[in-house]
């Protein structure tokens, strides 16, 4: 089955053919660690986690190298540290740890590599030096800037033209720039800002050059896949591409450019500046990470996704249905299986996750029918296929009872099980008054009882 991916550069789906099937490389822009990441920041984390899982399934776990950087040099980080009166590393360590915690709660695999900007100053300065030496960059008033006019293909990725950029400019252009679109590779640091020595004076790098240098150092001059949110296509990815190609003379930086769409809130782009953000670090206190993950994958990754309370409720209900089928079949072991052809076909068509998850319900229905019929062979086969298919998207890896019981502690679990046993005894004795009273007692504990052919099960209320 051929994997097709939509390449932003080509403006079309293309068959994915890695340069080396034994070392498939992918780079995705990671967090700037100055605060908790919002749910929109986590959409690419989850989307490219699915691609990472798919590539590992196709080419082998050891054959895929996924790098996701950490930006730990930034004005916002400096401002946060100053406001709190602490060292910059206190801020970056705190929010990187929180980012890792949230990413794990959303069931994402850690990347193969996680390069930090502060740990790559040598390669960053070296790459800037190469650009200056070959005429692609110039020094001016303590800054080093990339000369966009020296790169004829500038604007190719985003479909922009240099002349249009001048006409559409709304900000004052620094007088030391040769062209308004020229961007900073190195800049002098202000007082109390971090700085590193360089041939152009003490200072720090611009954002774009950090990624170019880290890609080069961790993955190589040309990589298979570069991913990120669509908001990064310009200027960040456009500038990365220009820097890397000019530094090495390579014809391409990435053979495939993938971008996910925005996450909206009531039709508006979600962003910290608009104050309409959802923070997973807080949301996870009340909502299972798997439900958040389901919501993020409920639409095609290239399309905008509108985040609503209803979306989360729908995601919980979808997982309830799937875990419910697995719970009813829990006495039968799952068979060894590959993902279903339908799920593989959906994911191979530019990561069509909505179509892929629809295939889960066909398998769960088959499990339900097999349970009703007492067909253990069919249960084994379909259960194995469902778990393998869902695992490819990072779903259904929890114990079904754990999913329904949520954060219930051992004391509560024991109390509910005792009440259920007493309720069964009352129903067996046809003491309906006692049975109803026990059910009301269970309800008061925040527990929902679900009666089924295999007996009563329970779950915590939402």
From Swiss-Prot:
Annotated residues for binding of Zn(2+): 29, 211, 236, 240
Binding of ATP, residues: 272
Pfam families (alphabetical): CysS_C, DALR_2, tRNA-synt_1e
A single BP term in Gene Ontology: cysteinyl-tRNA aminoacylation
Domain of life: Bacteria
Keyword Ligase: yes
Residue interval(s) of motif 'KMSKS' region: 269-273
Co-factor: note: Binds 1 zinc ion per subunit.
Short sequence motif named 'HIGH' region, residue ranges: 31-41
Entry cofactors: Zn(2+)
EC number: 6.1.1.16
Record GO terms (molecular function): ATP binding; cysteine-tRNA ligase activity; zinc ion binding
Keywords of the record: Aminoacyl-tRNA synthetase, ATP-binding, Cytoplasm, Ligase, Metal-binding, Nucleotide-binding, Protein biosynthesis, Zinc
UniProt GO cellular component terms: cytosol
Major subcellular location class: cytoplasm
CDD domains: CysRS_core
Catalytic reaction annotation: tRNA(Cys) + L-cysteine + ATP = L-cysteinyl-tRNA(Cys) + AMP + diphosphate
Subcellular compartments: Cytoplasm
Family statement: Belongs to the class-I aminoacyl-tRNA synthetase family.
Protein's name according to its UniProt entry: Cysteine--tRNA ligase
